[in-house]
């Protein structure tokens, strides 16, 4: 960011007009000044994620206090175990309720560049396609991001069918044609 003002100085006045906010831990800290709960899961079965749900809910309440117009606060979570082994999860605070995904354990990450964009694109798609199902929209966003980690380059070249297959638990990695 190199525009003569800090990201916080530019974004804080604008954020008051949003209905939906999304980001990872650094964005929430930089723009709103609040530190989300750390995500330190070490594998997909790690229960520390569930143990932190009350803190994630408090985080969501704090976002809504700071941005009263905001109806949905998405938080994408990543714990980098090694340079190519990452754990992903996400939470959504909406209607005074916390929703969460499971944990994706990506052991052979190809390229993480663009994974945040894939999450946001998946979130927008999910909100449009599942307008009355925030849980499904959240799961779609994270599945799109998880799959992007397996694709080289900045763009997510996976299909809707591949994202939905992952959402349904198909993690076999088998090629389907």
Model region roles, listed by residue range:
Residues 1-97:
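Conserved phosphate/ATP/ADP-binding segment of small-molecule kinases
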């Amino acid at each position: 960011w190199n525009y003569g003002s800090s990201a916080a100085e530019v974004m804080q006045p604008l954020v008051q007009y949003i209905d939906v906010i999304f980001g990872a831990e650094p964005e929430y800290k930089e723009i709103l000044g609040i530190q989300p709960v750390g995500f330190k899961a070490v594998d997909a079965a790690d229960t520390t994620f569930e143990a932190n749900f009350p803190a994630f809910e408090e985080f969501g309440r704090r976002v809504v206090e700071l941005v009263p117009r905001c109806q949905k606060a998405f938080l994408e979570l990543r714990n980098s175990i090694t340079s190519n082994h990452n754990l992903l999860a996400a939470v959504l605070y909406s209607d005074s309720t916390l929703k969460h995904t499971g944990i994706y354990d990506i052991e052979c990450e190809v390229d993480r560049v663009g994974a945040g964009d894939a999450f946001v694109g998946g979130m927008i798609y999910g909100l449009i396609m599942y307008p009355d199902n925030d849980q499904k929209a959240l799961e779609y966003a994270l599945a799109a991001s998880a799959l992007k980690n397996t694709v080289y380059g900045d763009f997510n070249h996976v299909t809707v069918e591949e994202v939905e297959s992952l959402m349904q638990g198909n993690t076999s990695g088998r090629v389907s044609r």
